[in-house]
């Protein structure tokens, strides 16, 4: 099947990674997607519903490769027990950057599609931005008795009813971090908490489902 799609430059990613990349937005009103239209870009991304095998086949015929599967989940917000989390401060940024850099080294921004350190740098910047209230609105942390950070979660308000988890990590602290996220959403009057993770991250999927989440959708990321 032919693919109709617009091509949009990824301005922020291009500046951050130093690449010339774009993303295709598939829509029936757009022109046909052709190799000539894709040629000016060194990297082109596409995100499609995992159930849409027609688009998957068509994009692969245009030279796209499957990079990652994504699962989006949602759970109802309730007032969970207090986890003892506190709001991260700017003094926590160096430690958080180091933790996020190590925890998210194998995302869709990995080699060979991007530089070997690209994924680590991207998520280190993400968590710093969350502390500063840029993109994600806040970062909450759990501290060990020593004062070291043992877990963190970033969160963003989407609209009047929904909030979304950005990054969540902390060995053995998953249940507490989910309580933290639910309390944050509850305090802001939200009814739904959303979170996405890689299809292959079974530990995260189990944690979210154990916390009451249901799968809402699945998607594939493809690159050319």
UniProtKB/Swiss-Prot annotation:
Reaction(s) the record says it catalyses: dTDP-4-amino-4,6-dideoxy-alpha-D-galactose + acetyl-CoA = dTDP-4-acetamido-4,6-dideoxy-alpha-D-galactose + CoA + H(+)
Active-site residue numbers: 208 (proton donor)
Gene Ontology molecular function: any one: N-acetyltransferase activity
Signal peptide: none
Ranges for domain N-acetyltransferase: 94-224
Record keyword Transferase present: yes
Top-level lineage group: Bacteria
GO terms under biological process: enterobacterial common antigen biosynthetic process
Entry keywords, A to Z: Acyltransferase, Transferase
Entry's EC annotation: 2.3.1.210
Pathway the protein contributes to: Bacterial outer membrane biogenesis; enterobacterial common antigen biosynthesis
Pfam families reported for this sequence: Acetyltransf_1
Keyword Transcription: no
List of residues binding acetyl-CoA: 168-174, 201, 207
Subunit structure: Homodimer.
Protein family membership: Belongs to the WecD family.
Task performed by this protein: Catalyzes the acetylation of dTDP-fucosamine (dTDP-4-amino-4,6-dideoxy-D-galactose) to dTDP-Fuc4NAc, which is utilized in the biosynthesis of the enterobacterial common antigen (ECA).
Protein name: dTDP-fucosamine acetyltransferase
Provenance organism: Escherichia coli (strain K12)
Name of the gene this protein is made from: wecD
